[in-house]
């Protein structure tokens, strides 16, 4: 029967493995909420599901755009609506999985009225200082460029206090009362997993993928400045050694995992130790089925 769950966790937490295993065993549909898996040309840097996985599991949210095409959270809302319609029509479970918690949060809370992103030349520190002065209730990290630009864009276009504007124009979210499970890892063990995954990505051809991408597309594109690719660009330009490349990807991925862990505290989720997660979720799927 149809039901839906969300599976969250940091990068390298094993979300995709758990989701794919459940999808195969229970014929579930999977919606990927990942900001890189949407791109057709980025496979290794995105840790995209394998071709075999994509061929044997009904996936939504993967291989939708070229890296020079722009998207926002509305793309994932549309993909969710397609995935839910597909699953409902066939009475199948739906698993929402991904490390980009912002998309899931927006799907739960709802979108606010559209505004254009600011084209201001102000840097993050300058926008953040303005924000603290005008709108101290708007909680945001200083390094969150997207949300800082969005905040400034709202203020420039409406002259309203952005936190009040967002509250006033909030629309109903598409996800209601969904059970959220978070894969939990000891921090030190997760660091080791990230280090191992970085090495595997390099062994599997990350540099070759980067060479092709940088030969075809502008290196300033947002997608090509993601972790894994921006460090490859430095290596290919002769700015860092291979050892530094591996270390930088590992460090930056570990920092990302820390930010993801912090963001995921916004959700009312059930923490699952990875080693026990599959057994617990199998039981849930068996009961629901």
Curated annotation (Swiss-Prot):
> Site positions for Interaction with substrate tRNA, renumbered to this chain?
100
Q: What class of enzyme is it?
A: transferase
| Gene3D superfamilies listed in its UniProt record | 1.10.20.140, P-loop containing nucleotide triphosphate hydrolases (3.40.50.300)
For this protein, the record's SUPFAM superfamilies field holds: P-loop containing nucleoside triphosphate hydrolases
Q: Does the keyword ATP-binding apply?
A: yes
**Assigned keywords, A-Z:** ATP-binding, Magnesium, Nucleotide-binding, Transferase, tRNA processing
GO biological process: what's one of them?
Answer: tRNA modification
Please give the positions of the paired cysteines in each disulfide bond.
Answer: none
Q: Name one GO molecular function term.
A: ATP binding
**What cofactor does its activity depend on?**
Mg(2+)
- Among the Pfam families in the record, one is IPPT
Q: What is its EC number?
A: 2.5.1.75
Amino-acid positions noted as binding ATP in the UniProt annotation, renumbered to this chain: 9-16
Task: Please tell me where substrate binds in this chain.
Answer: 11-16
- Keyword Transferase attributed: yes
Family, per the entry?
A: Belongs to the IPP transferase family.
Summarize the subunit comment: Monomer.
Biological role? Catalyzes the transfer of a dimethylallyl group onto the adenine at position 37 in tRNAs that read codons beginning with uridine, leading to the formation of N6-(dimethylallyl)adenosine (i(6)A).
> Which NCBIfam families does the UniProt record give?
miaA (TIGR00174)
What is the name of the protein in this document?
tRNA dimethylallyltransferase
Gene, per the UniProt record: miaA
């Amino acid at each position: 029967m149809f039901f839906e769950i969300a599976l969250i966790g940091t990068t390298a937490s094993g979300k995709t493995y758990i989701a794919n295993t459940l999808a195969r065993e229970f014929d579930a549909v999977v919606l990927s909420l990942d900001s890189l898996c949407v791109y057709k040309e980025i496979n290794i840097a995105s840790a995209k599901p394998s071709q075999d996985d994509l061929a044997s599991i009904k996936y939504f949210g993967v291989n939708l755009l070229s890296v020079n095409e722009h998207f926002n959270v509305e793309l994932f809302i549309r993909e969710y609506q397609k995935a839910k319609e597909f699953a409902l029509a066939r009475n199948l479970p739906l698993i929402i999985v991904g490390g980009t918690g912002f998309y899931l949060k927006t799907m739960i809370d709802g979108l606010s009225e559209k505004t254009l992103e600011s084209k201001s030349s102000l840097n993050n520190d300058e926008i953040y200082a303005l924000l603290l002065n005008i709108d101290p209730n708007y909680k945001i990290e200083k390094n969150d460029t997207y949300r800082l630009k969005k905040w400034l864009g709202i203020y420039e276009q409406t002259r309203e206090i952005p936190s009040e504007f967002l509250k006033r124009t909030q629309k109903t979210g598409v996800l209601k009362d969904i059970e959220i499970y978070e894969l939990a890892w000891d921090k030190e063990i997760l660091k080791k997993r990230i280090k191992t995954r970085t090495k595997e990505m390099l062994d599997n051809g990350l540099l070759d993928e980067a060479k092709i991408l940088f030969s075809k597309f502008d290196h300033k594109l947002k997608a090509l400045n993601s972790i894994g690719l921006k460090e490859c660009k430095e290596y290919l330009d002769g700015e860092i050694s291979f050892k530094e490349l591996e270390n930088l990807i590992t460090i930056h991925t570990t920092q990302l995992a820390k930010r993801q862990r912090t963001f995921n505290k916004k959700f009312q989720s059930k923490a699952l130790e990875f080693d026990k997660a599959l057994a617990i979720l199998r039981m849930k799927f068996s009961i629901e089925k």
